[in-house]
């Protein structure tokens, strides 16, 4: 191993040891009961709640997927995606957070999202709980796979080891850490990792701009790439066998492609995903007091805006400094790694790599924990064995963690996977399956249990149908699957609710008490 790689490895090992230390510290508290293991006993402060929510939300996608899109095809796709995410983050904290925290307590102290949905409609047969748990298992397993792809790409790029070997190493570390501490450990470490992520993003960007000779020089270096710096146009890399061609050290681009209103709407639709994102919604439920949500929202927005802007600019700066270094869409996602290793001393590059590891851990532990809770708490205790003890539920949850990890590993075996693509599908799945359900559950008293079931099935099903059947038709049908699936889910909720018997007086009275803050 080269001396530089060894120094990077040492820094990353120290970082991982610190993360594991947090897990061990919180393990005893996490094991007390299921509320502490899955929701931290509703004890999160505003800073931890905000930054752990955003760190677990963004994942390695923030440091690899988003910069990779900017490097590969320019500003438009990355900018409009980030704009949608920023707006979605703000609205979610402003509109959903307080009502969801209050309602989750009123709904028999629900500690998971499926449990909240089921209790909201006073279910006896737990159909909503079962369906929502199944969708969570499916989409979070896909989401976890994207994190393992990030680990594999990171370690194989750094150390020249086989992708699969490095992906398995990353999976083992994340699994062990998640087994240790549960939600409290996850949230505490996510807070630390959110700090690491934003620091390394800003540091690498600043150094990259300085090495390029300033922002003006960055833009000068890429201005001749057609559509690269436009908001309503997009660059089109000329490829052969998926590899971008270059002439005399200059990357080849075709004619600028139009980026019209449909494309903008498609990318802005990413913001809709927040309303159905369990790892974010759980932080709303877990904050210790309602009056701390306003401060948490401000913290979250500052972090999100800085991080997204820095991630996009890293992709642009990377193309300006190293225009032909990364020649496929998959390789482009290594631009942050490439910049860090090229511009930073080995020890600082190790810290930057720890930033990617931080992003990956902060997301994958959330995904694994929520998926395991969906099976153990919601399916097993909620449906199959209602008298199961907390100890049984936590034991089963820990058994399910390696099972879910193994399935995610199978999905992540392809080293040519594009992180952005994997994340976008899982994001659409959660947004369309649960987003409309969350909004209508919190703000429409007339919504019925049948409407909730119809909304979940139609939204989740339409994501698959649009992605696999309709989207390949191209043209207007090429829009991001989240938008049509979200709309379809909302329509089904309204129509089916109005066609079925109104909720009982007990359910409606509970809704009014929550609305009034009683």
Predicted regions and their residues:
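Membrane-embedded helix-loop-helix hairpins and adjacent transmembrane boundary segments
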Residues: 1-518
């Amino acid at each position: 191993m080269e001396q530089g790689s060894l120094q990077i490895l040492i820094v990353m090992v120290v970082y991982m040891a610190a993360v594991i230390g947090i897990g061990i510290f919180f393990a005893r508290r996490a094991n007390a009961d299921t509320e502490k293991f899955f929701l931290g006993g509703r004890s999160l402060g505003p800073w931890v709640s905000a930054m752990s929510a955003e760190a677990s939300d963004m994942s390695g996608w923030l440091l690899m997927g988003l910069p990779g899109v900017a490097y590969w095809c320019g500003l438009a796709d990355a900018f409009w995606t980030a704009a949608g995410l920023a707006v979605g983050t703000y609205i979610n904290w402003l509109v959903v957070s307080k009502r969801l925290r209050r309602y989750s307590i009123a709904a028999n102290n629900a500690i998971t999202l499926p449990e909240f949905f089921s209790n909201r409609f006073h279910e006896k047969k737990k159909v909503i709980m079962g369906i929502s748990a199944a969708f969570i298992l499916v989409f979070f397993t896909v989401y976890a796979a994207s994190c393992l792809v990030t680990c594999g790409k990171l370690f194989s790029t750094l150390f020249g080891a086989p992708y699969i070997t490095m992906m398995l190493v990353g999976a083992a570390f994340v699994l062990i850490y998640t087994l240790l501490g549960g939600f409290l450990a996850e949230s505490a470490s996510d807070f630390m990792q959110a700090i690491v992520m934003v620091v390394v993003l800003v540091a690498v960007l600043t150094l990259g701009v300085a090495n390029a000779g300033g922002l003006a020089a960055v833009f000068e270096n890429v201005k001749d790439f057609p559509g690269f710096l436009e908001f309503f146009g997009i660059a089109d890399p000329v490829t052969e066998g998926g590899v971008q061609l270059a002439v005399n050290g200059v990357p080849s681009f075709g004619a600028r492609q139009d980026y019209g209103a449909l494309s903008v709407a498609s990318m802005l639709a990413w913001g809709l995903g927040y309303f159905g994102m369990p790892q974010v919604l759980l932080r709303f439920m877990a904050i210790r007091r309602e009056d701390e949500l306003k401060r948490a929202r401000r913290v979250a927005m500052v972090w999100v805006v800085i991080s997204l802007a820095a991630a996009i600019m890293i992709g642009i700066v990377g193309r300006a400094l190293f225009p032909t270094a990364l020649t496929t869409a998959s390789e482009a996602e290594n631009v942050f790694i490439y910049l860090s290793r090229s511009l930073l001393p080995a020890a600082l590059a190790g810290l930057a790599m720890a930033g990617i590891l931080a992003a990956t851990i902060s997301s994958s532990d959330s995904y694994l924990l929520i998926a395991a809770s969906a099976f153990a708490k919601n399916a097993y205790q909620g449906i199959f064995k209602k008298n199961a003890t907390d100890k049984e539920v936590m034991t089963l949850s820990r058994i399910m963690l390696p099972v879910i990890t193994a399935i995610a590993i199978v999905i992540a075996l392809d080293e040519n996977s594009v992180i952005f693509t994997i994340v976008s599908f899982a994001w659409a799945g959660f947004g369309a399956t649960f987003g409309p359900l969350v909004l209508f559950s919190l703000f429409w008293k007339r919504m019925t249990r049948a409407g909730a079931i119809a909304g979940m099935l139609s939204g989740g099903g339409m994501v698959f149908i649009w992605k696999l059947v309709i989207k390949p038709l191209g043209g207007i049908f090429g829009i991001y699957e989240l938008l049509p699936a979200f709309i379809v889910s909302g329509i089904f909720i309204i129509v089916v609710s109005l066609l079925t018997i109104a909720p009982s007086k007990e359910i409606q009275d509970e809704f009014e008490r929550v609305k009034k803050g009683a």
